[in-house]
C-alpha cells in the first residue's frame, strides 16, 4: 500500500516554518518500532526492514515535505521569546483513510534555524523515555502523542556525558502549540494569529467553520480539552515536569515528554524535574499552571475575540476540571453514585497516604479488592497507623453499601480505572541502561507490558521501586 501525504501546514502557513531535511546519524539502526500503531496507520512492514531509512532521516517517502516549525513561549513563567523545533522536523502529514491526518515528526533530526545553542540531536535515553511514556499514557486512555520508532547510532551526543545519538518518530494529529500563537502575538502580527486560529478550526474543528461565533466556541473547547487532560493526569499520578506554554497542545494532547514522572509515594508537592527549583511544575500545581497557560493563549486571541468571551471560557476551566476529576476519582473509589460525603472520604484517604507516603498506584489498585461486608483488607498492611486506616475504612465500606451493587460489579469497575502498572522512572531507567549496552530485550518487554496496564501481574513491574529507583532525578536534557 502506498502512503499518502498532504502539505497543509506548508501550503497554508508559509511564515511559520523553515523547509529543510533531516541530517542522518552515523551507522543508524532501528531498534524498536510500534507494530500496533504501524498497522493502524497502514504502514507497510517492509518500511521497517530496509535499514534506518525514513526512521533515521536517511530517506523521505513520496509526498513528504520536511520543515521545522517556529513558535515562542513562556518557560517557567517567564517570556522566553522565539523557540521552535530545535531538534525536530515535521516530515509530513499522512492522509488517513477516514480523511484525518497524522503528523510524522522526527525528533533528533539535526540542526535547524531554531536550535539556538543546541546541537539538534536527541540521545537514546530521552527517546526511550518518550516512547515508553507516550505509549503508557495511550494505553491508560489519556490523550497523547504516540511513538512509532526509535533509531540509535554510533554518533556521540554530549550532554552531562557522551551518549548515543538517537531519533524518535513521533506521530500526532497535530503539533499545534500554544506557543505558535504567542510567537506572532508578541511580534504584533495579530492577523497571523488569526490565520493560525482559522487553520486550526478548518482542519480540527471543522464543524465550527461557518459559525459566526466560531472563535469563542473553539477557544471554549480548547479550554475544555485542556481541563480534561489535566484532570486525567492528576487521577493517574502523572507529573509532566515542564509545562511551558510551548509544550501545551492545542488539541489537548500530552506533548513533549521530558523530565516527567509518575508518583511512587503519594506526595502532593512532588517535583519530577530537578531544574524546577521553585516547584512551579509540581504535581499539585499542574491544574493552576494549565489555567495560567490558557490565559496566555487567550491573550493572543484578544485582538479579534471579545475579552468577555475569552474570560467566560477561562472561567469554565475549574468546573470542567473538577467534573472530570470527580467522576474519575469516584470510579477509582468504586462509587456508583455521587454522595455528599465522597469528597471528604477521598481527602481523608489522601491525608492518610501523604502522612505515610503510601504508594499511589498500589493503594488504589489494592482498594479495588475491597469487599463491602468484610472488615479485612489487604490494604491495611500498607499503613503503619492501623487505627486511622480502620476508622477510614469502616466509613468507606459504609459508603459502598449505599450504592447497592455487588462486589464483583464494583471491583470490575475499579480495576478498569486503577492501573496495576504505570511507567515508574526506575522501570524506564532499567530499560535505558540495558539498551545503552546493546540489549534491547527489556525495552521490548516493557513496551509490551505497558499495553495492558489494568491487568494483574505478579512481577516487579507492579512492585514498589527498589531503593536505587526511588526519587530518581530527571533533567530536561534530551
Curated annotation (Swiss-Prot):
* Residues noted as binding Mg(2+) in the record, renumbered to the chain: 247, 256
Asked whether the keyword Glycosyltransferase is assigned, the reply is no
Q: Where is the active site?
A: 246
Q: What EC class does the entry list?
A: transferase
Work out whether the entry's keyword set contains ATP-binding: yes
Q: Name one GO molecular function term.
A: AMPylase activity
Looking up PANTHER family in the UniProt record yields: PROTEIN ADENYLYLTRANSFERASE SELO, MITOCHONDRIAL (PTHR32057:SF14)
Biological role stated in the UniProt entry: Nucleotidyltransferase involved in the post-translational modification of proteins. It can catalyze the addition of adenosine monophosphate (AMP) or uridine monophosphate (UMP) to a protein, resulting in modifications known as AMPylation and UMPylation.
What is the protein's name according to its record? Protein nucleotidyltransferase YdiU
- Give the gene name: ydiU
Amino acid at each position: 500500500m502506498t502512503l499518502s501525504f498532504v502539505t497543509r501546514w506548508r501550503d497554508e502557513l508559509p511564515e511559520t516554518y523553515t523547509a529543510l531535511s533531516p541530517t542522518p546519524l552515523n551507522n543508524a539502526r532501528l531498534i524498536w518500532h510500534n507494530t500496533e500503531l504501524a498497522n493502524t496507520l497502514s504502514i507497510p512492514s517492509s518500511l521497517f526492514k530496509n535499514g534506518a531509512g525514513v526512521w533515521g532521516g536517511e530517506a523521505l517517502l513520496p509526498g513528504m515535505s520536511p520543515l521545522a516549525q517556529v513558535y515562542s513561549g513562556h518557560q517557567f513563567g517567564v517570556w522566553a521569546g522565539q523557540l521552535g523545533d530545535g531538534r525536530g522536523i515535521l516530515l509530513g502529514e499522512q492522509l488517513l483513510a477516514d480523511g484525518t491526518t497524522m503528523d510524522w515528526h522526527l525528533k533528533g533530526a539535526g540542526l535547524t534555524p531554531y536550535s539556538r545553542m543546541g546541537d539538534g540531536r536527541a540521545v537514546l535515553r530521552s527517546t526511550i523515555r518518550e516512547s515508553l511514556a507516550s505509549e503508557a499514557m495511550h494505553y491508560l486512555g489519556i490523550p497523547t502523542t504516540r511513538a512509532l520508532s526509535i533509531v540509535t547510532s554510533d554518533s556521540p551526543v554530549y550532554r552531562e556525558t557522551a551518549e548515543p545519538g538517537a531519533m524518535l518518530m513521533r506521530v500526532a494529529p497535530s503539533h499545534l502549540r500554544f506557543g505558535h500563537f504567542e510567537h506572532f502575538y508578541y511580534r504584533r502580527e495579530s492577523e497571523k494569529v488569526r490565520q493560525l486560529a482559522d487553520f486550526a478550526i478548518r482542519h480540527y474543528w471543522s464543524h465550527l467553520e461557518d459559525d459566526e461565533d466560531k472563535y469563542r466556541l473553539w477557544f471554549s473547547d480548547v479550554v475544555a480539552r485542556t481541563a480534561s487532560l489535566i484532570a486525567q493526569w492528576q487521577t493517574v499520578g502523572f507529573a509532566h515536569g515542564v509545562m511551558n506554554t510551548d509544550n501545551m497542545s492545542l488539541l489537548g494532547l500530552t506533548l513533549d515528554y521530558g523530565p516527567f514522572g509518575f508518583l511512587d509515594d503519594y506526595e502532593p508537592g512532588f517535583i519530577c524535574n530537578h531544574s524546577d527549583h521553585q516547584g512551579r511544575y509540581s504535581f499539585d500545581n499542574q491544574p493552576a499552571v494549565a489555567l495560567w497557560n490558557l490565559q496566555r493563549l487567550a491573550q493572543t486571541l484578544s485582538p479579534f475575540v471579545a475579552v468577555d468571551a475569552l474570560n467566560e471560557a477561562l472561567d469554565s476551566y475549574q468546573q470542567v476540571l473538577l467534573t472530570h476529576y470527580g467522576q474519575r476519582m469516584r470510579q477509582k473509589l468504586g462509587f456508583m453514585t455521587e454522595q455528599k460525603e465522597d469528597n471528604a472520604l477521598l481527602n481523608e484517604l489522601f491525608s492518610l497516604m501523604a502522612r505515610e507516603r503510601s504508594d499511589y498506584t498500589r493503594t488504589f489498585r489494592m482498594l479495588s479488592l475491597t469487599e463491602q461486608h468484610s472488615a479485612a483488607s489487604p490494604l491495611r498492611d500498607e499503613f503503619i497507623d492501623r487505627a486511622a486506616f480502620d476508622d477510614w475504612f469502616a466509613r468507606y465500606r459504609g459508603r459502598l453499601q449505599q450504592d447497592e451493587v455487588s462486589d464483583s460489579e464494583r471491583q470490575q469497575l475499579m480495576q478498569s480505572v486503577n492501573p496495576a502498572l504505570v511507567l515508574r522512572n526506575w522501570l524506564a531507567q532499567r530499560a535505558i541502561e540495558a539498551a545503552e549496552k546493546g540489549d534491547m530485550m527489556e525495552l521490548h518487554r516493557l513496551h509490551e507490558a505497558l499495553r495492558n496496564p489494568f491487568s494483574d501481574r505478579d512481577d516487579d513491574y507492579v512492585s514498589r521501586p527498589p531503593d536505587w529507583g526511588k526519587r530518581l532525578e530527571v533533567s530536561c536534557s534530551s
